[in-house]
């Protein structure tokens, strides 16, 4: 079976993990954590990066940091992972879902302003497949209405929008280092990017169980105490060691994934030209990271038939999110603003093909040949 995904392995992970084990410190904020955070800050230009156990934890941390209260409204696309919404629902917020653009599956920036009320606190753009949302428009809306922007850049590590790294444009950005992402911290992991310097001190406190422990270890206070609400949002240094190996090889991983993505695009372009499928669209000003390669079929039946055909050929291809507004929790905790013109329809057409760092050329050729055979 050719899997849909396999965690990236570059070969130096075990060496760094053994080094972490020999250091005598495996908990959070060890040497490898500091290396990773500094690398991310310097590479992407964020004021402060804090490693977390997951992107889910980063989103929850953002909701705490922005002091989301019951009754507040948070705008986001319905076509996203449940964590995007859960983080704010946990604080009592109401989720306001907005339709997506069919070209990128990102939130339609032209529909956001109509969804803003006097209760709106946050806009959460989700950079689907590592392709940027229209951030200039979103940030202008946030400034006009005095709102915060939390970028769900779970899939966006190494992607840019008009030269700026995804996750560094909004007030807060959230990365994922889950094993399904381009870079992993040994299976699970995330990072919170604090781009508004006024939020840094409280972010450190919330991440450290509500204490000023970070200031204590920097020698800024003689003891640390309970200062605020918080939780334990630290990644273990053993996981950070795994992540460090991946970040050292980040450019190599990125180039390999982009090459695999382009192979698919070039091979399937004739099918798109013939109108049989649709291929991903990368808007001007966006540089993507080849997080995924998807095609769009005619409808859900067409997609199901192809999934079954590929499965019989020992190839795993998968659809993606069930739109949140149609789920029981989505109906309870949120509402869809305006018309669902594209979210549901486009989600039922989308199929993701195998794409991961260690995908062999022969296996990718097999996937392509099988697809071409199906459509012939």
Swiss-Prot record:
Top-tier EC class: transferase
Q: Can you say what this protein is called?
A: dTDP-4-amino-4,6-dideoxygalactose transaminase
| Any single biological process term in GO | polysaccharide biosynthetic process
Temperature dependence of activity: Optimum temperature is 37 degrees Celsius.
Q: SUPFAM superfamilies from the xrefs?
A: PLP-dependent transferases
Q: Which residues form a coiled coil?
A: none
Recorded effect of pH on activity: Optimum pH is 7.5.
Tell me what gene encodes this. Answer: wecE
């Amino acid at each position: 079976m050719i899997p849909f995904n396999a965690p990236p392995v570059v070969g130096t992970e075990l060496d760094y993990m053994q080094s972490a084990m020999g250091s005598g410190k495996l908990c959070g904020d060890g040497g490898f954590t500091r290396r990773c955070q500094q690398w991310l800050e310097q590479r992407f230009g964020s004021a402060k990066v804090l490693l977390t156990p997951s992107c889910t934890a980063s989103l929850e941390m953002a909701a705490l940091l922005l002091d989301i209260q019951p009754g507040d409204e948070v705008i986001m696309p319905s076509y996203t992972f449940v964590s995007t919404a859960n983080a704010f629902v946990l604080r009592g917020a109401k989720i306001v879902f907005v339709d997506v653009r069919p070209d990128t599956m990102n939130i339609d920036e032209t529909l956001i302003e109509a969804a803003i009320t006097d209760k709106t606190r946050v806009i959460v753009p989700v950079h689907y497949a590592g392709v940027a949302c229209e951030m200039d428009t979103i940030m202008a809306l946030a400034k006009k209405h005095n709102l915060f922007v939390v970028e769900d850049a779970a899939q966006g590590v190494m992607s840019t929008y008009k030269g700026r790294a995804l996750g560094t444009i909004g007030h807060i950005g959230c990365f994922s280092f889950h094993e399904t992402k381009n870079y992993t911290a040994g299976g699970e992991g995330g990072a919170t990017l604090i781009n508004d310097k006024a939020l840094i001190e409280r972010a450190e406190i919330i991440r450290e169980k509500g204490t000023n422990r970070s200031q204590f270890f920097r020698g800024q206070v003689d003891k640390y105490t309970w200062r605020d609400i918080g939780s334990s949002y630290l990644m273990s240094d053993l996981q950070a060691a795994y992540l460090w190996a991946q970040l050292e090889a980040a450019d190599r991983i990125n180039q390999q994934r982009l090459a695999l993505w382009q192979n698919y695009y070039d091979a399937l372009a004739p099918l798109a030209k013939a109108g049989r499928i649709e291929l991903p669209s990368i808007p001007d000003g966006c540089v993507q990271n080849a997080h995924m390669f998807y095609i769009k079929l005619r409808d859900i039946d067409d997609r199901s038939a192809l999934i079954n055909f590929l499965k019989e050929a020992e190839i795993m291809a998968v659809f993606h999110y069930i739109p949140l507004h149609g789920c029981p929790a989505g109906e309870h905790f949120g509402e869809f603003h305006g018309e669902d013109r594209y979210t549901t329809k486009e989600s039922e057409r989308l199929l993701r093909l195998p794409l991961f760092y260690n995908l062999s050329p022969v296996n990718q050729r097999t996937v392509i040949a099988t697809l071409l055979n199906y459509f012939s």
